[in-house]
Amino acid sequence: MTAPITIIGSGHAGITLARELRRLSPELPIRVLTRDDGHYYYKPDLSKAFAAGKDAEGLIKSTAEQLREQLKIELRCRTTVTRIEPAAHRIWVGDQALDYSKLVLATGATPIRLPLSGSAADAVLTVNDREDYARFRAALPDKARVLILGAGLIGCEFANDLAAHGHAVQVADLAGWPLPRLLPEAQGRALQTALSGLGVQWHLGTGLASLDREGGAITAQLANGQRVVVDVVLSAVGLRAATALASEAGLTTRLGVVVDDRLQTSAADVYALGDCVEIGGRLLPYILPIANAVKALAPTLLGTPTKARFPAMPVIVKTPACPTLVNPPPAVEGGWEVTGTAPDLEAVFKDASGRPVGFALTGKATAKRADYVPLMPAIHEPAA
């Protein structure tokens, strides 16, 4: 009996691949292993659940049992893969060995955790999956006071969603303005002003010194001397590609699991997909590249090697208070050129040669997306 194609991870990447494989091959044996409950949901919905009027259960699009029936797959939930043996085409779940024909790592990314001190350091929550979100919602009282650590994409999206629905939100970040890695200062300030209009308070240019429990609340001591009293602390300081399993198996890892143009790792018949991937020296930490990757990887797994191409894919930041669209520039020397009047701003990032390699649009300027996308280089162009 042929060993199944095995996918580690049941997030958007893993399930999208399983769907495409099943579409292309109705009888193919497919096994999916996941550490969580296996229910499928759309991860970007986590940071706009209040706006959608949904709790954690309401975010489920397909239950694990429905996935098994719809896709005719073996889906093992609450299952942790502890070891990969690429040479043997085998993985281990504790002391149980499972053979595979081809293996796909769709392990995603894990939250970066700040080293914190104080009696409430262990009370900090992160939201990286639906079960995390359930714990976060359970911790929120009505009209909660929430401190968000991090003014990046996830921090700003949660700030918008929470503040727009009656919660008192404060955001702390070492940076001088929101989305500092994605926006020039003028646009970051426009976003800051819009979120301030919802009641969001900002503590920028400062870090967190300690967190302590006082009564039923948490007191955050900021590095600038300010004290903030809140009910809940949410850490949104970023994600790190989940590479441990691959690294322990001897696969090449750097920022992520290193893959070639066909998404194969340094080991034969082992591939990677989604947030854990590094291709051409870059991570692909957003949802849109997954569709392109799957369209290449599925036929590759079925015997038709196909290279993945990733064109420019602007990211929609879910901050309705200030609509924002970003095509992040690569890590190259250059600078932003900004035009317009806040909040309706257009920004182009040009490299040292003057070539446009990124853009950002805020407010009404987001309507000009189609003007900018054709000017952008691909995120990754496979070798000829």
PLM feature spans:
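Rossmann-like dinucleotide-binding cores of NAD(P)H-dependent redox enzymes
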Residues: 60, 154-210, 290, 308-324
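A conserved beta-strand/loop element that lines the FAD pocket in flavoprotein oxidoreductases
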Residues: 68-85, 198-208
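Mid-to-C-terminal Rossmann-like scaffold of FAD/NAD(P)H-dependent oxidoreductases
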Residues: 2-3, 10, 276-370
